[in-house]
């Protein structure tokens, strides 16, 4: 049974003309799969490899190089929150904010809240020092005003 839907396979194929080789589509393919499945299962690695005419080891090497991909043993929650831990964010309370958010969700960075709604991750720098401390939720940067605000935005209530 196929892990990848036909629509995601088609989205991957649509990238072939945009890149100089099929191998160059590895990273976008991994992103597409994780976005849809909230992880990159072993079966998906094999299917991506087949589509890109690579070995599964080549796809896995790319996946394991980047810390933001998850396998099926540790899938993402419905919303992924990156809290910046750069110096400007830490100087403006980022450490305390991170500790309070993790304490209230009963998780450590990299973990999912019990309801699998939220995954908290650490980001080295989000390039938004003027908003320090800040966070990235999916693809959008937000000021991380306080723990209540972080949790509201993370849970889609703001």
Residue ranges of model-derived segments:
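Signature of N-terminal electron-transfer/Fe-S-associated modules in redox systems
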Residues: 1-158
